[in-house]
Amino acid sequence: MAHSKHGLKEEMTMKYHMEGCVNGHKFVITGEGIGYPFKGKQTINLCVIEGGPLPFSEDILSAGFKYGDRIFTEYPQDIVDYFKNSCPAGYTWGRSFLFEDGAVCICNVDITVSVKENCIYHKSIFNGMNFPADGPVMKKMTTNWEASCEKIMPVPKQGILKGDVSMYLLLKDGGRYRCQFDTVYKAKSVPSKMPEWHFIQHKLLREDRSDAKNQKWQLTEHAIAFPSALA
């Protein structure tokens, strides 16, 4: 793959902006980071600039910043990389989150690449509702998302990919909190070639970096695409 063809380099900077509302609480988050598209690794630092401190677990937002920024996925040569091929125009993705206790979130994201700035811009809108007051999200009992594997399915007639994965938030008491992710990825330009169905394995870690003035945290992710060993 000719990296310059898609406006991507081995190392890219990222800038993030999210506006959202969870259980009626509005907030704005910004962030910056560094990622390695061809190694599938990235690290970002986020800060709540409006609406902080958040009255709910920030882990539910992590999946709006990551688990969809698929440019940073290590793809083998035998699988078409839909996400890098969409650059520099980029792509959009929309995701529904259905939690086991009936809570629901919707996240819509727009991703573009600035070749001049060597930067990937990530803008998102996040809305969540119906989180129980005594549940793990509102009581901030989550610690991180468990490593997982998303099935990626092409829809050639529409030029989109659909993602399906059952996710689990790890809890402080050792339990798990289940959430179903359904995602639609759509390139802004017409794809010249679609991939076959495949999987993306990913691991996301959050570390608190808050100070006396602002709620902050760091996210690191590693993502690798692979075909079925049995297909």
Swiss-Prot record:
InterPro entries in the record: GFP, GFP-related
Subunit text: Homotetramer.
Positions of the record's site feature: Cleavage: F65, K66
PTM field: Contains a chromophore consisting of modified amino acid residues. The chromophore is formed by autocatalytic backbone condensation between Xaa-N and Gly-(N+2), and oxidation of Tyr-(N+1) to didehydrotyrosine. In addition, the residue N lysine undergoes cyclization. Maturation of the chromophore requires nothing other than molecular oxygen.
Lineage start: Eukaryota, Metazoa, Cnidaria, Anthozoa, Hexacorallia
Residues with PTM 2,3-didehydrotyrosine: Y67
TM regions (residue ranges): none
Protein name: GFP-like fluorescent chromoprotein FP538
Keyword tags: Amidation, Chromophore, Luminescence, Photoprotein
Sequence position, cross-link 2-tetrahydro-2-pyridyl-5-imidazolinone (Lys-Gly): K66-G68
Species of provenance: Zoanthus sp.
Function noted in UniProt: Pigment protein that is yellow in color.
Gene3D superfamilies reported in the protein's UniProt record: Green fluorescent protein (2.40.155.10)
